[in-house]
Amino acid sequence: MYVIVGLGNPDKKYEHTRHNIGFDVIDALADKYNISVTDKKHKALCGSGVIEGMKVLLVKPQTYMNLSGESVAEVMNFYKLDPDEEMIVIFDDISLEPGRIRIRKKGSAGGHNGIKSIIAMTGTQGFSRIKVGVGEKPQGWDLADHVLGRFSSEDRAKVEEAIGHAMDAAVLMMQGETDKAMNIYN
């Protein structure tokens, strides 16, 4: 089984904000593959199903971003899965412009508190990830205000395209085609 985690914050007021782009990708995967992500367990909303013939668990941690690792570690431990081999984490990246995605096989947190938490709680940096660009904060803005803000209509259109790319990349990665996904989307 593969676990695909989308990072975000649980309150309704955060829906479709920059920081919740991971949730948006999970919702799009759930819609496309008819998976209900409504089971409340492991401090998350979870949904199991099949994507392109592979068993998958879609996960939206409900711990708030900075504690995402609590939920992720609980999921991986419960199912006895290796995060380095059986998990993809999807999250926002302010260093990428809206509409871009970047795939990594492993790496540091790069300043992202949700990823810091996952690394701390799972004990590894070796998990695959898909970063979805949300754009740099405007000069003089507070970072929290930027990532908790919504996209302009122009940027939202670009982000919708990126969500589709992130979904396609996740499927390729589950199929063992991470290098191919990187060549297409990075």
From Swiss-Prot:
Superkingdom of source: Bacteria
Subcellular location: Cytoplasm
Cross-referenced Pfam families: Pept_tRNA_hydro (PF01195)
Keywords: Cytoplasm, Hydrolase, RNA-binding, tRNA-binding
Binding site for tRNA: Y14, Y64, N66, N113
Chain positions of site Stabilizes the basic form of H active site to accept a proton: D92
Enzyme class: hydrolase
Enzyme Commission number(s) from the entry: 3.1.1.29
InterPro entries named in the record: Pept_tRNA_hydro (IPR001328), Pept_tRNA_hydro_CS (IPR018171), Pept_tRNA_hydro_sf (IPR036416)
Family annotation (Gene3D superfamilies): Peptidyl-tRNA hydrolase
GO molecular-function term, one example from the UniProt record: peptidyl-tRNA hydrolase activity
Catalytic reaction equation(s): an N-acyl-L-alpha-aminoacyl-tRNA + H2O = an N-acyl-L-amino acid + a tRNA + H(+)
Residues forming the catalytic site: H19
Single biological process term from Gene Ontology: rescue of stalled ribosome
Position of the signal peptide: none
Site note Discriminates between blocked and unblocked aminoacyl-tRNA, residues: N9
Transmembrane feature ranges: none
Cellular component GO terms, alphabetical: cytoplasm
Functional summary from the UniProt entry: Hydrolyzes ribosome-free peptidyl-tRNAs (with 1 or more amino acids incorporated), which drop off the ribosome during protein synthesis, or as a result of ribosome stalling.
Subunit structure, interactors included: Monomer.
HAMAP family the UniProt entry points to: Pept_tRNA_hydro_bact
Family, as annotated: Belongs to the PTH family.
Protein name (Swiss-Prot/TrEMBL): Peptidyl-tRNA hydrolase
Lineage, opening ranks: Bacteria, Bacillati, Bacillota, Clostridia, Lachnospirales
Gene name in the database record: pth
